[in-house]
A protein has these predicted regions:
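Compositionally biased terminal segments of proteins
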Residues: 1-184
């Protein structure tokens, strides 16, 4: 097991222990459904309130750089915060669950998948990972996200609900990116 997996697993164990609903997205989720690649951080969407923020911060202890005020501000603004493992410099980015329709739908579709040889974890669905990565492409950060999408389609393509992606790509304004990907 890599040092990243150890750190990520420890953080996931804390979320589970505290009963904080979460969902892994980003490159870690893309790797779970697609092709392996190097990643040095993990993106996690959380549904966290102020009380849980304090418990979470305290549970991380001295092993992590964590700023409770940053967590509380992220909760207030529906923004994001991060923690960094103080020994290895490994980062976990947390995004507070937003109220937008797509974000709520994505969170409702999360699923348990194997994370490592020790545990299962809650991931965004492969369809939702594809949609989020296309949103990032729309914002200008494209190459690695496009490669992740192609990897998911290559490895998990037969299990992907294409009509769901068609529907949400249209609703969130990324059909042009999706149509280009489907034609390649």
């Amino acid at each position: 097991m890599t040092s990243e997996q150890n750190v990520f697993g420890h953080v996931l164990d804390i979320l589970e222990k505290l009963g904080i609903p979460y969902m892994i997205g980003g490159s870690v989720a893309a790797i779970a459904y697609g092709e392996p690649r190097l990643t040095l951080d993990m993106d996690v969407v959380v549904k966290m309130d102020r009380d849980k923020a304090k418990e979470f911060s305290e549970s991380l202890g001295q092993e992590y750089y964590v700023n409770l005020d940053s967590i509380l501000e992220a909760i207030r603004s529906k923004g994001h915060f991060n923690i960094i493992n103080s020994e290895q410099g490994i980062k976990v980015d947390f995004y507070i669950l937003k109220d937008e329709a797509f974000d709520q739908e994505e969170f409702s579709r999360r699923r348990k998948e194997s994370f490592d040889n020790i545990r299962e974890a809650t991931f965004a669905s492969p369809e939702d990972v594809i949609l989020k990565k296309m949103e990032w492409c729309k914002m200008g950060e494209s190459e690695k996200h496009l490669e992740d999408i192609k990897g998911i389609l290559k490895i998990s393509g037969s299990k992907i609900d294409l009509s769901y992606i068609d529907e949400w790509a249209s609703k969130i304004g990324i059909s042009d990116i999706w149509n280009k990907l489907k034609s390649t």
